C-alpha cells in the first residue's frame, strides 16, 4: 500500500482559455455530490499560483506568461520532490497542462539517476516550442521542454533574447536536461497535432497509440505493450489531460477533440497502469468548469482519480 499525498495546483497561466484554475474545486464539488470523503482522506498541499499575471500585459507573444510558468516549475517541482523524498506518492491535480513540466522536474530532482518514462494521455502532443507555436500558449509546450527540444528545424518565429533565455531556463530547469528521452514517451489517444510536432514524433520515432488501436487491441493488451516498451525505465509518470476523452463527454476542457476515449476506456487504462510498481506519480489536468454543463467533466475526472488512487492503495 502506498502513502498518497494530493498536490493541488490551481494554475492556469499556461492555458489560452480562462477557467482551468477552477478545475480542482469543481472536482471537489463532484466528490461531495458523490458523498465521498476522498479529499479529507489524504494529506494535501495547495500550491500558490501566478494567476495574477492573467491581468497583466503579455510580454512574449510566442511564450505567453513564460515567467509565470517558470515560477510554477519552481513551486510544483519542490512539492513533488519533497513528497517523493518523504516516501509519499504524489497525486497532482492541476489547472493547465504546462504544470506537468514542473511535475516531471520534481520527479527528476527527487530521483536524479532515474530513467523516467512518461505516459502522456492527451489529445495533443504538447511538443510545441516558442519557435513553432501557433498560439503562444505554454500548455502546448511541456513535453518539448521535458525533452529539451527547440525544434529549430521547424522554426516559424524568431524569438527576442529575453524569451529565448527564459525558454532555455525552462528546458534546463533543475540543471537536469533532458529530463525525459523522446523514446521514453508514450502518447495515448493523440489525435490533434501540427506538422511541427509531427516532425519531432517522426524524428525520434516516438510511440503513439491511437484511440482506434486501443479499441482493436483492448486496454489489457495496450497496457502490457506500453509497459513492455518502457521496460528499461526505472520510474513511470502518468499524465492525464481530460481532453484525451471524447469531445462528447469532455466539453468542460479548453480544447476538446472528437474520436477520443470513452470514460470506461480511460478508467480501465489508468487503473491498469497504476498496478505497475514503477509508476511514481499521477497527474490529472485541464478540467475547466466554466465551459462545462452540470459539472460532468469534473465528475468523470473524479471517478478516474478515485479509481486510480484505490488501485494504488491496494498495491
Spans of features found by a protein language model:
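Conserved alpha-helical scaffold segments that buttress catalytic/binding sites
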Residues: 2-315
Amino acid at each position: 500500500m502506498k502513502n498518497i499525498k494530493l498536490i493541488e495546483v490551481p494554475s492556469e497561466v499556461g492555458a489560452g482559455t480562462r477557467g482551468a484554475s477552477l478545475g480542482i474545486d469543481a472536482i471537489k464539488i463532484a466528490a461531495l455530490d458523490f458523498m465521498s470523503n476522498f479529499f479529507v482522506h489524504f494529506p494535501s498541499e495547495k500550491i500558490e499560483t501566478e494567476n495574477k499575471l492573467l491581468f497583466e500585459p503579455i510580454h512574449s507573444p510566442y511564450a505567453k506568461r513564460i515567467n509565470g510558468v517558470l515560477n510554477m516549475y519552481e513551486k510544483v517541482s519542490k512539492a513533488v520532490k519533497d513528497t517523493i523524498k518523504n516516501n509519499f506518492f504524489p497525486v497532482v491535480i492541476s489547472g493547465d497542462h504546462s504544470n506537468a513540466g514542473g511535475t516531471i522536474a520534481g520527479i527528476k530532482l527527487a530521483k536524479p539517476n532515474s530513467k523516467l518514462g512518461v505516459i502522456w494521455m492527451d489529445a495533443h502532443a504538447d511538443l510545441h516550442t516558442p519557435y513553432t507555436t501557433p498560439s503562444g500558449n505554454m500548455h502546448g509546450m511541456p513535453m518539448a521542454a521535458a525533452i529539451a527540444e527547440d525544434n529549430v528545424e521547424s522554426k516559424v518565429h524568431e524569438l527576442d533574447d529575453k524569451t529565448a533565455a527564459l525558454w532555455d531556463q525552462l528546458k534546463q530547469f533543475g540543471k537536469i536536461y533532458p529530463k525525459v528521452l523522446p523514446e521514453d514517451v508514450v502518447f495515448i489517444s493523440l489525435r490533434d497535432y501540427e506538422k511541427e510536432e509531427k516532425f519531432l514524433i517522426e524524428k525520434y520515432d516516438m510511440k503513439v497509440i491511437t484511440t482506434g488501436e486501443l479499441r482493436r487491441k483492448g486496454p489489457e493488451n495496450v497496457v502490457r505493450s506500453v509497459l513492455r516498451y518502457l521496460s528499461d525505465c526505472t520510474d513511470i509518470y502518468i499524465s492525464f489531460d481530460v481532453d484525451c476523452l471524447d469531445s462528447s463527454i469532455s466539453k468542460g476542457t479548453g480544447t476538446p477533440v472528437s474520436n477520443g476515449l470513452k470514460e470506461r476506456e480511460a478508467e480501465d487504462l489508468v487503473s491498469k497502469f497504476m498496478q505497475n510498481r514503477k509508476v511514481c506519480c499521477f497527474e490529472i489536468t485541464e478540467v475547466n468548469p466554466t465551459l462545462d454543463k452540470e459539472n460532468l467533466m469534473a465528475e468523470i475526472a473524479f471517478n478516474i482519480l478515485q479509481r486510480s488512487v484505490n488501485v494504488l492503495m491496494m498495491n
